[in-house]
Amino acid sequence: MLLSKINSLAHLRAAPCNDLHATKLAPGKEKEPLESQYQVGPLLGSGGFGSVYSGIRVADNLPVAIKHVEKDRISDWGELPNGTRVPMEVVLLKKVSSDFSGVIRLLDWFERPDSFVLILERPEPVQDLFDFITERGALQEDLARGFFWQVLEAVRHCHNCGVLHRDIKDENILIDLSRGEIKLIDFGSGALLKDTVYTDFDGTRVYSPPEWIRYHRYHGRSAAVWSLGILLYDMVCGDIPFEHDEEIIKGQVFFRQTVSSECQHLIKWCLSLRPSDRPSFEEIRNHPWMQGDLLPQAASEIHLHSLSPGSSK
């Protein structure tokens, strides 16, 4: 039963971060060719980031995602400890990849003359949160709480590793339907976490905070909390609260569904117009709504019956 599995994950905490010096991947030219190690399957998706294909690791039949990123589309570069110049996305993924299950793991990477290829874990069966909500509508609060807790822990893990995701949204959250676990994906808009102000943003505008819309400036932690507020609203109402810049700047939240007063309070707190008024991660974790119980298994089984074949057994 998926919901009971989600409940069992509530104890999870951010894991130690990966030490870049401890696991150095050799430059692509020193490896066996990608084609000899991975079998490339159908296209999963494409966009400004490049293209992602399903795949299988030949050695053990492990399902993987194979992401191709063209070099001329890469605007932010980083450097590994061995001096290799790579997309910042590779640097960030290597920093957050660990035994912590809430963030997608980078398994390998390859450099080609005109592109980079990233090999990422691919859980099965899986569905992103956008499609999950689109198919089912607004989520019951117990289910939303289970997902939101895991997203919060994933974002905390990233920050503990010195990584700012900068594109927290439903499309970047995968739900492993067999385990009830979420995974935060797509670090292509991310950056190294810093205490000073950011003046660039490449994430999704309707999840961006009002200070970015008005002043093109924001601090990483408070902007992440704003995005979490948008995400929680999306879960319990079935859609995002703001579509246009003027709505983001006003920050007036209207609830389209029946939502408990405690959940409303948490959402509005995260969506405070002044960044300094927003809660910290610890305050979110300790909020009364986050301490609520999940539905009994019988009720949740009805709610989640259509998740996937056998997932509610």
UniProtKB/Swiss-Prot annotation:
<comment type="function">
    <text>Proto-oncogene with serine/threonine kinase activity involved in cell survival and cell proliferation and thus providing a selective advantage in tumorigenesis. Exerts its oncogenic activity through: the regulation of MYC transcriptional activity, the regulation of cell cycle progression and by phosphorylation and inhibition of proapoptotic proteins (BAD, MAP3K5, FOXO3). Phosphorylation of MYC leads to an increase of MYC protein stability and thereby an increase of transcriptional activity.</text>
</comment>
<feature type="binding site">
    <location>
        <position position="121"/>
    </location>
    <ligand>
        <name>ATP</name>
    </ligand>
</feature>
<keyword id="KW-0723">Serine/threonine-protein kinase</keyword>
<feature type="modified residue" description="Phosphoserine">
    <location>
        <position position="98"/>
    </location>
</feature>
<keyword id="KW-0808">Transferase</keyword>
<keyword id="KW-0131">Cell cycle</keyword>
<dbReference type="GO" id="GO:0071346">
    <property type="term" value="P:cellular response to type II interferon"/>
</dbReference>
<protein>
    <recommendedName>
        <fullName>Serine/threonine-protein kinase pim-1</fullName>
        <ecNumber>2.7.11.1</ecNumber>
    </recommendedName>
</protein>
<feature type="modified residue" description="Phosphoserine">
    <location>
        <position position="8"/>
    </location>
</feature>
<keyword id="KW-0053">Apoptosis</keyword>
<dbReference type="GO" id="GO:0005654">
    <property type="term" value="C:nucleoplasm"/>
</dbReference>
<keyword id="KW-0479">Metal-binding</keyword>
<keyword id="KW-0067">ATP-binding</keyword>
<keyword id="KW-0656">Proto-oncogene</keyword>
<keyword id="KW-0832">Ubl conjugation</keyword>
<dbReference type="InterPro" id="IPR017441">
    <property type="entry name" value="Protein_kinase_ATP_BS"/>
</dbReference>
<dbReference type="GO" id="GO:0005524">
    <property type="term" value="F:ATP binding"/>
</dbReference>
<feature type="domain" description="Protein kinase">
    <location>
        <begin position="38"/>
        <end position="290"/>
    </location>
</feature>
<dbReference type="InterPro" id="IPR017348">
    <property type="entry name" value="PIM1/2/3"/>
</dbReference>
<keyword id="KW-0418">Kinase</keyword>
<dbReference type="GO" id="GO:0106310">
    <property type="term" value="F:protein serine kinase activity"/>
</dbReference>
<dbReference type="GO" id="GO:0022898">
    <property type="term" value="P:regulation of transmembrane transporter activity"/>
</dbReference>
<dbReference type="GO" id="GO:0005886">
    <property type="term" value="C:plasma membrane"/>
</dbReference>
<feature type="modified residue" description="Phosphothreonine">
    <location>
        <position position="23"/>
    </location>
</feature>
<keyword id="KW-0963">Cytoplasm</keyword>
<dbReference type="GO" id="GO:0045824">
    <property type="term" value="P:negative regulation of innate immune response"/>
</dbReference>
<dbReference type="Pfam" id="PF00069">
    <property type="entry name" value="Pkinase"/>
</dbReference>
<dbReference type="GO" id="GO:0006915">
    <property type="term" value="P:apoptotic process"/>
</dbReference>
<dbReference type="InterPro" id="IPR000719">
    <property type="entry name" value="Prot_kinase_dom"/>
</dbReference>
<dbReference type="GO" id="GO:0030145">
    <property type="term" value="F:manganese ion binding"/>
</dbReference>
<feature type="binding site">
    <location>
        <begin position="44"/>
        <end position="52"/>
    </location>
    <ligand>
        <name>ATP</name>
    </ligand>
</feature>
<keyword id="KW-0597">Phosphoprotein</keyword>
<dbReference type="GO" id="GO:0005730">
    <property type="term" value="C:nucleolus"/>
</dbReference>
<keyword id="KW-1003">Cell membrane</keyword>
<dbReference type="GO" id="GO:1990748">
    <property type="term" value="P:cellular detoxification"/>
</dbReference>
<feature type="binding site">
    <location>
        <position position="67"/>
    </location>
    <ligand>
        <name>ATP</name>
    </ligand>
</feature>
<feature type="modified residue" description="Phosphoserine">
    <location>
        <position position="261"/>
    </location>
</feature>
<dbReference type="GO" id="GO:0060045">
    <property type="term" value="P:positive regulation of cardiac muscle cell proliferation"/>
</dbReference>
<dbReference type="GO" id="GO:0043066">
    <property type="term" value="P:negative regulation of apoptotic process"/>
</dbReference>
<dbReference type="InterPro" id="IPR011009">
    <property type="entry name" value="Kinase-like_dom_sf"/>
</dbReference>
<dbReference type="GO" id="GO:0070561">
    <property type="term" value="P:vitamin D receptor signaling pathway"/>
</dbReference>
<dbReference type="GO" id="GO:0004674">
    <property type="term" value="F:protein serine/threonine kinase activity"/>
</dbReference>
